[in-house]
A protein has these predicted regions:
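A nucleotide-sugar donor-handling region in carbohydrate enzymes
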Residues: 154-255
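Short glycine/proline-centered loop/turn elements that form peptide/ligand docking sites
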Residues: 336-342, 350-365
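Leloir-type glycosyltransferase catalytic cores
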Residues: 364-411
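Active-site and donor-binding regions of nucleotide-sugar-utilizing enzymes
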Residues: 25-191, 339-341
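Short, charged, surface-exposed secondary-structure boundary motifs
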Residues: 64-69, 92-95, 160-165, 317-324, ...
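N-terminal beta-strand-loop-alpha-helix module at the start
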Residues: 4-49, 253-258, 268-282, 286
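Conserved catalytic-core segment of nucleotide-activated headgroup transferases in glycan assembly
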Residues: 231-298
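Donor nucleotide-activated moiety binding/catalytic core segment of transferases
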Residues: 294-344
Length: 411
């Protein structure tokens, strides 16, 4: 049996919602824990303003990958106000449709399509702020209403970086210079086309950002206090609903964040760097709380010293762990991660960036062009968030900086 298109699946989901007595108000596209947390925060904010919304959640995680969230994690699912669809399972997306987005902005309504009555309030297309949704999502959303508004949700650090630079990294994975050149040309041409489409959509459809910062440009973006407030409310709500004590005491601890970038970097280089970082944490008189990346294969995890606490529970995000804690960590060390950014903005927890150390080791070990480009991008990213992430250029500085932060904590 063939899998239906997204538009067909969305129309069926609308009929399902209407059968339960709800009007569809939004179509959401995302795949991560942060996406769902941000969606829940936005839905809670709207409910506080007296607008309780119902809608369709499209989990567009890649085929074969484990979903990062459950349907019941979404606000309103237990009340029957949410229908969840998964790409490759409940629907398929016509990828090239993005190129035809201009013609979709005012699409004809097919005779088999149910047009949502937008006389009372708008219909929302909600997506992560890293790029833009595929044209098929626009087609599905526009089949519901001409009165369309877009909500771009927080994607973490990726929200503030160029998606083109990320795509270029994958081109560098090609060993053949010819294939690499062809892929680079293809990506650059596609980036120009998408930028043109972005301009069209931004002029035709109102877009509202709901993320850590109010703007994406500049070296010192303004914090969105509304987002911070509602995300913290979400953390507290989830904690109270769990009915168990999830709090940890992070006093005297430094959180070290694992990574899952074995496509670009030799894991032995990362492991060696982490072991040196752990030694520096100990030299500062502090303890390491190691958080492996949820997507990091267990076979890649290096042998840790016995005094290092390892958190191997991916059901809670780092941000949730910190929110629930009875005492906050001294610092968060990593490669310009979202947890460092949110930790700094939400709770004033210092971030320590070690991307320069990684880049130096990659160059010393004659890492490939993809590894060098990858680490260069990390270094540039850390530099952009210098207000929240202290970029370290020598391993010895880590213990010095940590001692300074620990002394501030004691005051």
């Amino acid at each position: 049996m063939s899998v239906p298109s997204l538009t067909s699946a969305a129309i069926k989901a609308v009929a399902d919602l209407k059968g339960r007595g709800f009007k569809p108000d939004f179509l959401f596209v995302g795949n991560s824990v942060l996406h769902i947390a941000s969606l829940n925060a936005w839905l809670s904010k709207m409910a506080h303003e007296g607008v309780v919304l119902s809608g369709i959640v499209c989990n567009d995680i890649q085929a074969g990958k484990k979903s990062q969230f459950l349907a019941r994690d979404i606000v309103g699912y237990d009340d029957g106000r949410i229908v969840c669809l998964r790409e490759h399972v409940d629907y398929v997306v016509n990828r090239p449709a993005t190129e035809r987005l201009k013609s979709l902005l005012v699409p004809p309504v097919g005779k088999n399509e149910v047009h949502y009555d937008a006389s009372s309030r708008p219909f929302y297309l909600i997506y992560s702020d890293h790029g833009m949704p595929n044209g098929e999502y626009w087609r599905a959303a526009l089949s519901m209403s001409d009165n369309l508004k877009c909500i771009a949700l927080e994607e973490g650090v990726a929200s503030y970086l160029s998606i083109e630079s990320e795509n270029l990294l994958f081109a560098y994975l090609h060993e053949s210079a010819v294939k690499r050149s062809l892929e680079l040309c293809k990506i650059r041409l596609l980036a120009r086309r998408k930028e043109h489409i972005r301009e069209l959509t931004s002029n035709a459809v109102p877009v509202e950002r709901f993320g850590v910062f109010l703007d994406k440009d500049g070296t010192a973006p303004r914090v969105n206090n509304d987002y911070v407030h509602w995300m913290k409310r979400q953390f507290e709500s989830k904690r109270s609903e769990s009915g168990s004590d999830l709090s940890k005491d992070f006093s005297g601890h430094v959180i070290l964040l694992g990574t899952a970038n074995e496509d670009f970097v030799d894991q032995e280089i990362v492991d060696g760097l982490f072991l040196d970082v752990i030694q520096e944490i100990a030299r500062a008189g502090l303890k390491t709380y190691y958080r492996p990346h949820p997507r990091q294969p267990k076979s890649f995890r290096f042998k840790l010293p016995s005094d290092v606490c390892v958190d191997d529970n991916p059901s809670l995000t780092v941000e949730e762990l910190i929110s629930y804690s009875s005492a906050k960590p001294v610092a968060i060390i990593g490669f310009c991660s979202t947890a460092q950014l949110i930790g700094g903005v939400f709770w004033d927890i210092p971030g320590i960036g070690i991307s320069k150390l990684l880049h130096k080791r990659i160059c010393e070990k004659t890492g490939g062009i993809a590894a060098r480009r990858f680490s260069e991008r990390l270094v540039d990213s850390e530099g952009r968030f210098g207000r929240y992430i202290d970029q370290i250029d020598s391993i010895e500085k880590i213990s010095y900086v940590l001692k300074k932060y620990a002394d501030l904590d004691k005051r």
